[in-house]
Amino acid sequence: MATYPCQLCGKTFLTLEKFTIHNYSHSRERPYKCLQPDCGKAFISRYKLMRHMATHSPQKSHQCAHCEKTFNRKDHLKNHLQTHDPNKMAFGCEECGKKYNTMLGYKRHLALHAASSGDLTCGVCALELGSTEVLLDHLKAHAEEKPPSGTKEKKHQCDHCERCFYTRKDVRRHLVVHTGCKDFLCQFCAQRFGRKDHLTRHTKKTHSQELMKESLQSGDLLSTFHSISPQFQLKAAPLSPFPLGAPAQNGLASSLPAEVHSHTHNPSEQTSQPVQALPELLAPLHPVAPPTSPPQPLQNHKYNTSSTSYSPLASLPLKADTKGFCNTNLLEDLPLQEPQSPHKLNPGFDLAKGGAGKVNLPKELPADAVNLTIPASLDLSPLLGFWQLPPPATQNAFGNSTLTLGPGESLPHRLSCLGQQQQDPSLAMSTMSLGQLPLPPIPHVFPAGTGSAILPHFHHAFR
C-alpha cells in the first residue's frame, strides 16, 4: 500500500487527499472560504467549511439538558457538557489559571505562552518555526485537527467507585455491578447476568455442545460440511451382493476382516448378519490375508461332554438361531404331525413328532443309524427348488452328502406332506435311500457375543 510521508514534520498519510489537507497547515493556504460578507474565515477542507456555515444559521437546534443554552453545532454542545461533569479531569495553567479537559488542549495553551516568551518551538509536535505569527498559525492548525487515538483519556468516572471510562455508555454498562440488576437469563441453565456480553461469553464457554446441537438441527452447519475439501470426504459405494458359493472378484475382499472373508468363500458358513459396505478409498490400505483354516466352533459348553448322561449328545451340533439367504432353517420352523412308531415308517411317510416342534439336523450320528426309503411317488422338487443344489459328488456342510437319522429321529413335516404329490415323473423311483439324496449346504454358525451356547433338547437323543 502506497503511503504519503510529509517532508516537513515526518507524518505519514494513507490517502492523497489527507496528505494535501495536511500540507495546507504548513503552507498556510486556505482554499475554502466563507461566503458571508461579514466573515472572512477560510478552511483547509470542504467539510470544515460546511460545519462553519452552521454557525451563521439563526436556528440553534442543539440545546443543553442541564441549562438553557443552545448551540448551532453538536460538537459545541458536547464541549459545553463537559462543564456540567463534576468528575471531569481538569488541566490548569499555572500562569493564567485556565483549565482544560484534555491534555492536547492544555499543551496547545502552553505553546502560546512559550511563543510569547520567545520560544518558537511547537509544544505539540516539537517543530521549530521562524516567527511568532507562523507559530500561532501552526498552533491553530493543531486546534482544528482531531486528537489522535493514543491521547484519548478516560474522563468519565463512575459515581459509586473510582473507575473511569472513555464514554458515558461505558459508565452505564458498568453500573450493573453496583445495582445488581441481572436481566439476561441463560437459556440452558438458570444463571443470570447483568450484561449481554457476559451472557454470550458464558454460553460459548459452558454450553458449546448445546449450541452445536442447535446449529446441527437448524441446518446451519450444512454448508460447512459441503465446504470441506473433496479429498477429505469418504464416499462409500454400494456393493452388489456376492453370489452364493462364488469368491469375490473385486478388490474389496482384501479389505474385509478374516471372518467376513472366510464366510464369503465358504457359503456353508454364511451368517445372518449382513456385511457392511466399506469405503472404496480404504480397500487398498488395509489388506488382510485370508484365513488358513476355517473358524473353530465355540467350545464354551455348559455341560461336561465326557459325562455318562451327556455322551449321546456329544456328536450332536449345537442349536443356532440362523436366518440365511435361502431360508435354510425351513425344516426347523415347520410344525410336525402326531408321532407314530419311531422305528416303523408307513408308505404314506408319516413321521414321528420331535420335542418342542423342531427337528435339529445332526452333524454326526451313531453308527447304527437307520436309512430311510423314499417311495417312487414322492416329488421333492417344490422343496429343493429353494436352493441351488451342488453336484451329487460334492461334500456338503456336514462333511457327507447323505442324511442319516438315528433310532427315534424323525423327518420334517414338509417331507411327509410332499409325499402325497407328484408333479414331475422324471423324479419317480422305485426305492431310494434318503442318504443318496443330495442336500444343500446348511449353515453351521455360532452366534458371537454369547457366553454359553444353546444346547439341543435331551429328549432328541433318548427317543
Curated annotation (Swiss-Prot):
SUPFAM superfamilies linked to this entry: beta-beta-alpha zinc fingers (SSF57667)
Matching PROSITE patterns: ZINC_FINGER_C2H2_1 (PS00028), ZINC_FINGER_C2H2_2 (PS50157)
C2H2-type zinc finger locations on the chain: 4-26, 32-56, 62-84, 91-113, 120-142, 156-178, 184-207
Ranges of Polar residues composition bias in the record: 298-310
TM helices/strands, residue ranges: none
Subcellular location: Nucleus
InterPro entries, per the entry: Znf_C2H2_sf (IPR036236), Znf_C2H2_type (IPR013087)
Main location: nucleus
Coiled coil: none
Residue numbers spanned by region Disordered: 285-310
Keyword list, A-Z: Activator, DNA-binding, Metal-binding, Nucleus, Repeat, Transcription, Transcription regulation, Zinc, Zinc-finger
Gene Ontology molecular function, alphabetical: DNA-binding transcription activator activity, RNA polymerase II-specific; DNA-binding transcription repressor activity, RNA polymerase II-specific; RNA polymerase II cis-regulatory region sequence-specific DNA binding; zinc ion binding
GO cellular component term, pick one: Golgi apparatus
Feature: compositional bias, Pro residues: 287-297
GO terms, biological process: negative regulation of transcription by RNA polymerase II; regulation of cytokine production; regulation of immune system process
Annotated function: Acts as a transcriptional activator. Involved in the transcriptional regulation of type 1 receptor for pituitary adenylate cyclase-activating polypeptide.
Protein family (similarity comment): Belongs to the krueppel C2H2-type zinc-finger protein family.
Subunit structure: Interacts with THRSP.
Protein name, as recorded: Zinc finger protein PLAGL1
Gene: PLAGL1
